[in-house]
Amino acid sequence: MFLVLERKMRTHQVFPLPLLLVIASVASENASTSRGCGLDLLPQYVSLCDLDAIWGIVVEAVAGAGALITLLLMLILLVRLPFIKDKERKRPVCLHFLFLLGTLGLFGLTFAFIIQMDETICSIRRFLWGVLFALCFSCLLSQAWRVRRLVRQGTSPASWQLVSLALCLMLVQVIIATEWLVLTVLRDTKPACAYEPMDFVMALIYDMVLLAITLAQSLFTLCGKFKRWKVNGAFILVTTFLSALIWVVWMTMYLFGNSLIKQGDAWSDPTLAITLAASGWVFVIFHAIPEIHYTLLPPLQENPPNYFDTSQPRMRETAFDEEMHLPRAYMENKAFSMDEHNAALRSAVGFSNGSLEQRSSSLGKKPSSLGNRPSAPFRSNVYQPTEMAVVLNGGTIPTAPPSHTGRHHW
């Protein structure tokens, strides 16, 4: 009996030992894992969920919301595309898609600056930063060229011209970024993450040139006789101006701010990530949404004036007559009545001559030397003056000469 009890006590003392080992291992893993992240998360993605470094979560949320809004705008533009009837508003649709694609790339690139660096991530950062900004600035420059033509001439370039200009301008930055990676990584066999901040900024000089040209071009969109397109030019001006301010701030912070606050490279990635998210939202709010809204508006229809509406001011009769060029039936009726009057006089003369011939023949006299005259017409063919003829003749009706009986035939 005592042996059985002793064996049970030994088994109860053995079972807690593995459980304690498991708890100790879990505690050690929790100590090494950041707060807010799971146990199986790779170390390079810790900044996406680390509650101790809250900047990563905030920038991640802002970039994710911007990406969703951009996708929604692309979907709306794609669905409403068949209903766009205005030719001038339909031409830049492809350019809008290209701009939204570049903006979506900026929001996606933000995540590459939140996670930890490795060779692949650094190559993506160095290549896509300049290329995506070049795409957005090229689309803005093409849009500024289009609005300038609309403001001055009322017509815009063709769709393929706008897209071709944007792609050709972006291709220059693609070549620059490719050469930078090839010369530093492949030829010199340096790590992709081993680059100085000044080298990163120098590789973006072409983007700065595009931004400056776009800002200057947008100023000319406010000068022209077609005023309804100046709103588009004003939004382009605001977008480029805010983008220029963002670039001045991030380059100052990236090149000089970290050394002044003695943080080393600790704030380099947050600075670049915040720049991408802020630039993307500026593009969405101040350019993409207004342009898509203006593109989807119904075409303007000029309604004819309601002449029975007493609330409208009266139009001048002289101006209305001069603008409409109404046909004047009065002159035509007057000419017609004058012809009728002449025909009546000729009939009266013919009737008098015929009466004289009859009287001379009854008296045995020879007819006069005036020749034969037509006889008097029947009463059914006698001229009957109209009301218009009476009005034009001053209210008097021409009468025929009296016959030999003394009565008028009319």
Curated annotation (Swiss-Prot):
InterPro entries: GPCR_3_C, RA-inducible_GPCR3. The chain crosses the membrane at residues 57-77, 95-115, 127-147, 165-185, 200-220, 235-255, 272-292. It comes from the Eukaryota. One of its GO terms (cellular component) is cell surface. Keywords: Cell membrane, Cytoplasmic vesicle, G-protein coupled receptor, Glycoprotein, Membrane, Phosphoprotein, Receptor, Signal, Transducer, Transmembrane, Transmembrane helix. Residues 78-94, 148-164, 221-234, 293-410 are cytoplasmic. Residues 29-56, 116-126, 186-199, 256-271 are extracellular. One of its GO terms (molecular function) is protein kinase activator activity. GO terms for biological process: cell volume homeostasis; glucose homeostasis; locomotory behavior; positive regulation of canonical NF-kappaB signal transduction; positive regulation of canonical Wnt signaling pathway; positive regulation of inflammatory response; positive regulation of macrophage cytokine production; positive regulation of neuron differentiation. Belongs to the G-protein coupled receptor 3 family. Residues 360-371 have a biased composition (Low complexity). This is G-protein coupled receptor family C group 5 member B. Glycans are attached at residue 30.
